[in-house]
């Protein structure tokens, strides 16, 4: 979500179009709004993407030792020992991961697990938007 003011372009929330692409097309730098600033734009509620189950963002391997009955959402080629798991993209394709994110959250939320574990993706391109959604899902 972007907006404009007298100083230029403002990025309110990362989405499918990477920040760098907006800057390239417009030829202008894009300012990002601080997360603590209250903005009246769609999707800005802190828990906008929150499933019913608790979502924990961290190191999956470490967190699996703490949570016995956990569902796991992960990215890339990992050997995860969990009954309920969803790989956003085995090939680390951010576009594929973005397309799978809400299905993953929904399926893991509907599982018999007590908690959903996930890690943040690379902070580049669509990874920023995916991480934003994961962080919102983790807010309770």
Regions from the PLM with identified roles:
Residues 1-140:
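Active-site-adjacent structural elements in enzyme catalytic cores
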């Amino acid at each position: 979500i972007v907006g404009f003011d007298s100083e230029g372009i403002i990025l309110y929330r990362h989405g499918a179009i990477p920040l760098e692409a907006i800057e390239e097309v417009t030829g202008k730098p894009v300012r990002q709004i601080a997360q603590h600033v209250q903005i009246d734009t769609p999707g800005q509620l802190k828990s906008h993407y929150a499933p019913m189950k608790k979502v924990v963002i961290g190191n999956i391997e470490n967190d699996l030792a703490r949570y016995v009955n956990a569902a796991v959402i992960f990215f890339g080629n990992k050997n995860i020992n969990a009954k309920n798991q969803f790989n956003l993209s085995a090939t680390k394709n951010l576009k594929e991961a973005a397309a799978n994110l809400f299905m993953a959250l929904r399926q893991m939320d509907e599982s018999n697990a007590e908690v959903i574990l996930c890690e943040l993706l690379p902070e580049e391109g669509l990874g920023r938007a995916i991480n934003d959604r994961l962080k919102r899902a983790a807010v309770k």
